[in-house]
């Protein structure tokens, strides 16, 4: 037994030394290419991953369609309704939760906001070269064309553009109180301007974790798609939340196939399937039937995952 214990200690020590060596090699490589004006996003992702590894922090990406109950699931894990999300996919922002006391918001840059304005108006064959051009246009006439969610987005920019530009002059990142976080997360007229909400809570359960409440899938927003892919590629654990009454739609299947096309779900990542709102089930047999259906659907895309049935109420 002593020989076995010594063997395991030596084995662990060898792996630890290999990890440290690899980590140092990557840091040196990053230092060499840091001034090369290419692949900035990739370089930043690698840097962030190394920082998390150094500090032994696990990044958990929570995914699902816009109404799957991701936020309610995270709140259930946290033990209170800390997380409030916008009901409007057009104005929604990614929320990043971690241990701490000072919460922050990262605003969209003018370029990002302009891109979203033009995306919303693309169907109407309208575009603007600058946000100032947009603000100076006939917005009353423009708003007559828009759907409800689009109208909320455009009206928010019209109403608070001066506030937004004033905040940008100081910084992209602003510290806000826990009470204000809810405003910037869930109210269209403020959430419109937010790229990321950094919610920090002094909860022991969050120590050693970063939890990302990703934007809803298939939102027809290129920024949302880009951010979803970035979170996917950098998460250590992927939780995929589906709703009991529509447990595996074509959209879910397309997303999982897209993950596999991106070469995600590799050996270093864990994937768990969460069926939310099982309190809607008639009985245990009803739950089992849905679990079997989801397992079969996952098998059809060659993915075999642990499935958890929960109620976030």
What does each of the following model-derived ranges do?
Residues 52-313:
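Globular "head" domains of long coiled-coil molecular machines
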């Amino acid at each position: 037994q002593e020989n076995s214990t010594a063997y395991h200690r030596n084995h662990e020590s060898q792996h630890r030394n290999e990890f440290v060596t690899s980590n140092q090699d990557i840091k040196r490589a990053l230092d060499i290419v840091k001034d090369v004006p290419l692949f900035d996003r990739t370089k930043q992702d690698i840097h962030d991953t190394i920082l998390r590894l150094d500090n032994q922090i696990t990044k958990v990406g929570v995914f699902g369609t816009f109404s799957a109950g991701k936020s309610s699931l995270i709140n259930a894990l946290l033990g209170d309704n800390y997380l409030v999300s916008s009901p409007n996919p057009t104005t929604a922002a990614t929320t990043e939760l971690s241990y701490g006391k000072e919460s922050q918001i990262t605003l969209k840059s003018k370029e990002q906001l302009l891109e979203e304005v033009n995306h919303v108006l693309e169907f109407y064959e309208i575009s603007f070269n600058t946000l100032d051009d947009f603000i100076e246009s006939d917005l009353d006439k423009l708003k007559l064309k828009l759907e409800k969610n689009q109208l909320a987005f455009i009206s928010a920019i019209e109403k608070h553009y001066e506030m937004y530009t004033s905040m940008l002059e100081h910084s992209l990142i602003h510290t806000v109180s826990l009470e204000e976080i809810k405003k910037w997360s869930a109210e269209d007229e403020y959430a419109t301007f937010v790229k990321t909400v950094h919610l920090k809570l002094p909860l022991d359960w969050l120590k050693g974790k970063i939890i990302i409440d990703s934007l809803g899938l298939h939102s027809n927003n290129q920024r949302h798609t880009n951010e979803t892919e970035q979170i996917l590629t950098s998460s250590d654990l992927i939780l995929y939340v589906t709703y009991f009454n529509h447990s595996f739609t074509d959209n879910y299947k397309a997303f999982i196939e897209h993950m596999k096309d991106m070469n995600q779900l590799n050996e270093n990542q864990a994937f768990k399937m969460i069926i939310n709102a099982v309190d809607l089930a008639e009985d245990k047999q009803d739950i089992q039937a849905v679990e079997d259906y989801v397992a079969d659907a996952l098998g059809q895309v060659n993915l075999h995952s642990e499935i958890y049935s929960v109620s976030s109420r």
